[in-house]
UniProtKB/Swiss-Prot annotation:
The keyword Cytoplasm applies. Keywords: Cytoplasm, Gluconeogenesis, Glycolysis, Isomerase. The active site is at 282 (proton donor), 303, 418. This is Glucose-6-phosphate isomerase. HAMAP family: G6P_isomerase (MF_00473).
Amino acid sequence: MSLKLEVKTEIKLDYQDFQNQINEFHKRINDKNSPDIIFLGWNNFPEVAINPQEIARMRKIVENLHQNSINVLVVIGIGGSYLGAKAALDFILGLGPFENKPEVIFLGNSLSSTDLYQKIEYLKTKNFAINVISKSGSTIEPAITFQILYQFLIDQIGEKLAKTRTFVTTSIKSGELLEIAKSNELEIFEVIESIGGRFSVLSSVGFFPLLFAKINVDEIIQGAIKAHKKYSTSSISQNLAYKYALFRFLMYKNFNYKTEILISYEPFLIYFNEWWKQLFGESEGKNLKGLFPASAIFTTDLHSLGQFIQDGSKNFFQTIIYIKKPKFDLGIKKLVQFNTKINKLSGKTVSEINFQAFLATTLAHSSYGNNPNLVLEIADSSPKTFGHLVMFFEKACAMSAYLLGVNPFDQPGVESYKNELAKNLGWDR
């Protein structure tokens, strides 16, 4: 997988002035004696993040489920417990619709009674299994959903069979969900203690749903291993992940930009963008610091946000992911019944037009709109590319947060709403 990075801005950026800082933080990310080693399991790849025995066990379970005509998996989780898997499924498969293929449904990521009710109604005619993902089991959204859905599954097929179709991904050390799994004799997959939720897609958290959907997990791992090696140097000129991190830092610190918009030209990247927003939002948004991570899908959002991006306030820059080779393509043929300018495009493909839109929009926004643009060109949307891109952003995120002067691996602000909600519900936390 090839990844190219191109900066389109009139702003002069001197990266080499920061090489000493990069060296220091690179050591902190990679040194076995780092004070943050308890959070760096994702970077100890594949030794810590990948458990071959557990993946083999998952494969056997998935094979058994499919043999028993269980073709729907309900993944219950919120934040990093589901965003990575959802991003991977859409990135690799596209948005469908699909016929006669295993289906993965995501629940427990909101407190919407309407969404939960409608999905349960849909499941009434399906043979489904459950994979609940939570490090502790105390997060309210997945906890409520799991309790309701597990009862529904028991009502449908009985408790004995329901136990064989329910899989728990959680800490194997302690937690409410671990106790539930043990007391009900449910299959358990491990949430690795040294890997935070937003960094966990390249682990058992993401792998079970992907295996169920018949995604080639081995290729995802191969792509991530290659990226891990590629971005293992501290040299800014040779490490694109660090160059991206430094670009973001300079936009924020030296030029006072407050927002980064991640832009993609494929609708199936919507949830990849959502995963990216959590990764950077939770890692950097603390101590009154950090770029606000926003996203858009072009050309769709050009018809809603395009005016603002071109002519509105200039407090943002754009990072663009462009996929060089589309998953599928369609040719445009002349239609004599339509006497329009579109007929002049006959012989071209839809992806060729999309590419021209990308070129035109990037030029308009960077040159005429005076918005700095950074372009990440990736080869395709294969499993290997997904693994590579995830590792690229995770390494960039850690470095970016250290440059900013914050801890990339905690999220103390999230506890505030949880504490207030607990008070409202009369809970002890």
